[in-house]
Amino acid sequence: FVMREEEPEPRTMMPETIPWKLLQGIALVQLYREEKWVEPPELDRLPYSLLYHQTISTLASTGELTPAELAQRVLTLSYFHRISADDYRVLLRHLIKIDHIQVTEGGGLIVGLAGERIINNFKFYAVFQENEEFTVRSESAELGTIVNPPPPGERIAIAGHCWIVEEVDWKRHTVFATQVKGRVPAYFGDCPGDINTHVLERMRKALNEHAAYPYLMGNARARLAQARHTAEISGAGTKPLINLGGDTWVLFPWLGSYAFLALERMLKIKCAAELGLRGLDPSRPYFMKADEETFFEVLAAEAEKDFDPIELVYPGEVPYFDRYDEFVPEELVCKGFAEGVLDIEGMKQRALSWRDHA
């Protein structure tokens, strides 16, 4: 591994002085050396995008099928073990509505005209998400292009400035944005390159332990020693919540991407009002009126509740995540994200484990 980083500025806040990429690289190497561990596949998602692909390709290869015959061929595939017949019925009705599937006079199903256009594209059988370019516009000005745009409310850097995303038009591949001040935080919400919680926990251990790693070069050893000193003084390696002065706080949850994303949404949607929380953003300090004890009490109380995962989807949000999500009903896209992508159970376990800090 080669990690490049800019020298932290003298007035940089504590979280930005820790070499996160270096810690991640160490964690990956150590997990393999110590446990022969590699990140496991995610087999319990709700892959509605892949379900669309398999449905259309099955009809294209076999010809007319009854709904029952189609369900028997597709839903019995092991990867779809969490998808119910009711969900499949919702998908089929939607595909008929948008003409990707057509109903014959005998009640059978065949590929529709719109579906034919998708199938005849040579890229159809590549089921993984491509890097498709989106045009970024602000009012009448075209700013440039990006790939994999973040959802509304997140920030992007383009044309030498920072912009907040107002709307994403997935059909026209256009992002509408408004210029704001500030820098762009590291965004990793809706990208496929997720990080497992086990990696983050090993990163924390690397920050706290005094072990030397023989594969590190001189500069890396020096940066690691500096980071360990910073963590020891600040408590970053042992305390999840640290006050940076006044009402400015930083939270170190040490969670993987999708448990982290669930925690961020829980705080914004369910806890922000009671905690006086504002400015919560990945990799940036946030502002909170409540004290440390209240923070953990409120978070644990919300984590204990038996809420519907769909409550962690923002109002009006349709979190397109996979290649063919745009052809899936919005209700299934939201359900697939809330119940199949967000690691709510991992988030709850971590939130409840912080009770002792309250």
Q: What annotation goes with each model-predicted range?
A:
Residues 1-43:
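Conserved segment of the helicase C-terminal RecA-like domain
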